[in-house]
């Protein structure tokens, strides 16, 4: 016979009693109660209807929640400008401008600059000359007003310490610079006004590597002359990416004459939204145009060595339109995992509806106490009694 300490049984009984008092050993089972409460019933059906409409109408159909998506396509952009223009200015005489002259850079990238106006300072050589009076701190009365070696943010060169005559009305500090300094006025009308009729060809290829799918915005045709005669139209020629510059600026909300005079920047956005469940038949580029800013210019120079052996340059201050091309896109295709996630989310929302209706019924309704007592019932097994003999 095995003996146990007297306190062991008492400790086990106390532990079991504690577990019972905490409800740890209680078993709960659901009890369904049919309640005739119109307010809660109507609220439940309306919420369920809202969830179903949201899941089916918005999440599944509108947002295509049944599709796996690729939001990071690989893109390639090639641009070509076509057109010629003639300018008549004293410094350059009659000059013909073609693509190599008015497009910067000439490689045809997604950011390029179209020259529409310019200011030329020809035959500059390095030496001493008076600063332009419009430059801050350039005007002077004596040599003391021109500290030697001083230069400013807007200065064309370094001061030599001399105050010299600029013209009949101004005296300015002499500088070491490319001389003569730039001093002309911007033409009142754009010198390359014909740029309005230039054409821009934009070839864009987009690749969705997740689905191994590629598409180009240019029509695949055996007719080599097609792109020489067509112009883009969203209805009749959606795959002819040839744009007239004047039309493009107008679609961006700008005026070509204003932008051509002092320059500006235009954004071109190409967006692809491809549904690959239809084999990409509706995968067409969507174009939009934005006027980003007014006023844009920069300077460039052509250098050569004169017959006298002196380095010489012609300085050009170019005004024009900067084009920025941005390509975005997304593609989707049916997949089981996103479909299951969307449907599962809807089922979770339906469960939340039941939870909210329970809160209304048990805590908010005027008969909440009655429904509480009806829904939650404590059941205990009957105690059995043994007759002692």
Curated annotation (Swiss-Prot):
Effect of gene knockout: P2rx6 null mice exhibit an apparent normal physiological behavior, weight, food or water intake. No significant changes in serum concentrations or urinary excretion are observed for Na(+), K(+), Ca(2+) and Mg(2+) in these mice.
One example of a Gene Ontology biological process annotation: response to ATP
Extracellular side: 67-335
Glycosylation: residue positions: 167, 197, 212
Membrane-topology annotation of the record: Multi-pass membrane protein
Annotated GO CC locations: dendritic spine; endoplasmic reticulum membrane; glutamatergic synapse; neuronal cell body; nuclear inner membrane; nucleus; parallel fiber to Purkinje cell synapse; plasma membrane
Tissue: Predominantly expressed in skeletal muscle. Also expressed in lung.
GO MF terms, alphabetically ordered: ATP binding; extracellularly ATP-gated monoatomic cation channel activity; protein-containing complex binding; purinergic nucleotide receptor activity
Compartments, as annotated in UniProt: Cell membrane; Endoplasmic reticulum; Nucleus; Nucleus inner membrane
Presence of keyword Transcription regulation: no
Disulfide bonds listed in the record: 129-179, 140-163, 146-173, 230-240, 274-283
Comment field on protein domains: An uncharged region within the N terminus of the P2RX6 subunit inhibits its assembly and exit from the endoplasmic reticulum.
Subunit structure: Unlike most P2RXs, P2RX6 does not seem to form homotrimers. P2RX6 are likely to form as obligate heteromers with other P2RXs subunits. Forms heterotrimer with P2RX2 with a variable subunit stoichiometry determined by subunit expression levels. Forms heterotrimer with P2RX4; functional differences between homomeric P2RX4 and P2RX4/6 heterotrimer are minor. Forms a P2RX2/P2RX4/P2RX6 heterotrimer. Interacts with SF3A1; resulting in a reduction of the splicing activity.
Protein name per the record: P2X purinoceptor 6
Biological classification of the source: Eukaryota, Metazoa, Chordata, Craniata, Vertebrata
Gene behind the chain: P2rx6
């Amino acid at each position: 016979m095995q003996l146990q300490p007297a306190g062991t049984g008492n400790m086990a009984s106390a532990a079991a009693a504690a577990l019972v008092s905490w409800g740890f050993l209680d078993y709960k089972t659901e009890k369904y109660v049919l309640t005739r409460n119109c307010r809660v019933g109507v609220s439940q059906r309306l919420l369920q209807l809202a969830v179903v409409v949201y899941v089916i109408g918005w999440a599944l159909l509108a947002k295509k929640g049944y599709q796996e998506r690729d939001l990071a396509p690989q893109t390639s952009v090639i641009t070509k400008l076509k057109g010629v223009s003639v300018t008549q200015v004293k410094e350059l005489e009659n000059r013909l401008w073609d693509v190599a002259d008015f497009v910067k850079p000439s490689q045809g990238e997604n950011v390029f600059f179209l020259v529409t106006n310019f200011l030329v300072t020809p035959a500059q050589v390095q030496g001493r000359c008076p600063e332009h009076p419009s430059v801050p701190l350039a005007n002077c009365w004596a040599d003391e007003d021109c500290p030697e070696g001083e230069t400013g943010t807007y200065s064309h060169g370094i001061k030599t310490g001399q105050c010299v005559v600029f013209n009949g009305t101004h005296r300015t500090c002499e500088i070491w610079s490319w001389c003569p300094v730039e001093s002309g006025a911007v033409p009142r009308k754009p010198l390359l006004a014909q740029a309005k009729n230039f054409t821009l060809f934009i070839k864009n290829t987009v690749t969705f590597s997740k689905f191994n799918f590629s598409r180009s915005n240019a029509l695949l045709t055996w007719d080599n002359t097609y792109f020489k005669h067509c112009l883009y139209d969203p209805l009749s020629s959606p795959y002819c990416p040839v744009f007239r510059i004047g039309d493009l600026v107008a679609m961006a909300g700008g005026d070509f004459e204003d932008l051509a005079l002092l320059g500006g920047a235009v954004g071109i956005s190409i967006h692809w939204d491809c549904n690959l469940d239809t084999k990409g038949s509706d995968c067409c580029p969507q174009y939009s145009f934005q006027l980003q800013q007014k006023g844009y210019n920069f300077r460039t120079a052509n250098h050569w060595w004169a017959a006298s052996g002196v380095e010489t340059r012609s300085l050009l201050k170019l005004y024009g339109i900067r084009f920025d091309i941005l390509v975005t896109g997304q593609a989707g295709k049916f997949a089981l995992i996103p479909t299951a996630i969307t449907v599962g989310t809807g089922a979770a929302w339906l469960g939340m509806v039941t939870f909210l209706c329970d809160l209304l019924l048990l805590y908010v309704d005027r008969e909440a106490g009655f429904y509480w007592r009806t829904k939650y019932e404590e059941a205990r097994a009957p105690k059995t009694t043994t007759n002692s003999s």
